[in-house]
A protein has these predicted regions:
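Active-site-proximal loop->helix
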Residues: 103-105, 113-171, 260-272, 380-386
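Short glycine/serine/threonine-rich phosphate/pyrophosphate-binding segments
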Residues: 82, 86-92, 106-124, 138-141, ...
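Buried hydrophobic positions in well-ordered alpha/beta secondary-structure cores of metabolic enzymes
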Residues: 12, 56, 73, 85, ...
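Glycine-rich ThDP/TPP pyrophosphate-binding loop and its adjacent helix/strand module
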Residues: 166-174, 181, 190-246
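A short, small-residue-rich loop immediately preceding and capping a beta-strand
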Residues: 80, 88, 98-133, 221-234, ...
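Active-site/ligand-binding loops adjacent to catalytic centers
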Residues: 168-194, 198, 246-247, 251-343, ...
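Claisen-condensing/thiolase-fold acyl-transfer catalytic domains that form or cleave C-C bonds
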Residues: 229-233, 237, 327-387
Length: 388
């Protein structure tokens, strides 16, 4: 164990001894790379010319009238690949190349991180293997096709609940067996150090852009920033640029069938969260759902039983609030944004839209991270809304 990369009592590097040195080397390489102007220039070039940055901020006028507050959307759904994930995969893949690694592995739930990893693997000519649970393969077939089309090997994970957490376990095992040549491209702000701060760094472009853009549109900073939180990469990427401002932070956790039920994925706001103690989980110390709670969300990208350690620390400090959004609330927001603005969100940011609706009585101006588009969720939506 190491106290590297801690956020108060959270974070750290809780891994077997054989992984301590590889992760320390990765941390050193990351710290050097982000101070290297050439690395920064290469990343910025690809984010602009391959990824399509900057993504715009859009005032959702009709939705604002409907909810009773000014709603601004940070359009990460317009990034190449359809979600915010490319910000991180480009950064980590360039770092892996710099370190002399020749293979990428990743976990994925909704398939967006797997797709973004397959994209950079193809771009940089690096063999790519993506671990994905059986449950998620079944509900995210389009993204499985996309990954395979771009040359990635998609490996089905059948253990346990066959979801995102099990995919992370499988990827960690692969990395432990082949860390000399392989880079584990972690998709969220979770895991042992340096992954949480590395992912935050590469996703912080979201907040840097949004902070400037909303001031141009609105004339001042928003009252609050809102984002969905599973592991929490899109949220920490938005929040980080506003950390020293008088701006409230709200995270929408997946409340599943209800925060007081035994089927949700909301460790900071679900049943038992007030009495919970931090646990060691997948290489980090963080908050995890109760043992008797079944990890569940209508959103494949949010059904993760823990939360990124920086979010756990922000909740403890009172810097951010986390609220459970049920499946039904997220689905209602999914439909409301589509009907109001002609924008079909992914089910993940639909949780953030639903939380913005709940917060509209408390704040005049809300900046919401629309971290992905809903193409991947259309089969689910068509069935649930009887659109066929």
């Amino acid at each position: 164990m190491s106290d590297a990369g801690t956020f108060g009592e959270y974070g750290g590097r809780y891994v077997p001894e054989p992984l301590q040195e590889p992760l320390a080397d990765l941390a050193d390489a990351f710290d050097e790379a982000i101070e290297d102007d050439e690395f920064r220039e290469d990343l910025d070039f690809l984010l602009e010319h391959f990824g399509g940055r900057p993504t715009p901020v859009f005032h959702a006028g009709t939705l604002s009238e409907r909810y009773g507050a000014e709603i601004y959307l940070k359009h990460e759904d317009l990034l190449h690949g359809g979600a915010h994930k490319l910000n991180n995969t480009l950064g980590q893949a360039l770092l892996a190349k710099r370190m002399g690694k020749d293979r990428l592995i990743a976990e994925t739930g909704a398939g967006q991180h797997g797709t973004a990893t397959a994209m950079v693997g193809a771009l940089l000519d690096m063999p790519t293997q993506v671990y994905m649970g059986t449950t998620d393969i079944g509900r995210q077939e389009m993204n499985v096709f996309r990954m395979r089309l771009m040359g990635a090997e998609v490996t089905e994970v059948t253990r346990g609940s066959a979801g995102l957490a099990e995919a992370v376990d499988a990827a960690l095992e692969d990395f432990a067996a082949d860390f000399e040549d392989t880079h584990y491209l972690v998709g969220s702000a979770v895991g042992p150090d340096p992954f949480p701060r590395m992912v935050r760094e590469f996703q912080s472009v979201i907040g840097r852009e949004a902070r400037e853009q909303i001031q141009e549109l609105y004339g001042e900073l928003p009252d609050a920033c809102v984002a969905c939180v599973g592991g929490g990469s899109n949220a920490i990427g938005l929040f980080h640029a506003f950390a020293d401002d008088d701006v409230a932070f709200y995270g929408a956790e997946p409340g599943g069938e209800g925060p007081d039920s035994n089927r949700h994925s909301a460790p900071l706001s679900g049943s038992g969260s007030a009495e919970s103690e931090p646990q060691q989980f997948q290489g980090m110390r963080t908050e995890v759902i109760d043992e008797g709670t079944e990890n569940h969300s209508v959103s494949a990208g949010l059904d993760y039983p823990a939360v990124g350690p920086e979010h756990a620390a922000m909740a403890e400090l009172g810097r951010a609030e986390y609220h459970a959004i049920t499946d039904d609330e997220a689905l209602e927001a999914f439909r409301e944004l589509a009907e109001s603005e002609g924008i079909i969100p992914a089910l993940e940011p639909s949780h953030a839209i639903a939380l913005a609706k709940r917060l509209a009585d408390e704040h005049d101006t809300l900046l919401v991270n629309l971290c992905g588009r809903g193409d991947k969720d259309m089969a689910t939506a068509a069935e649930l809304f009887d659109l066929t």
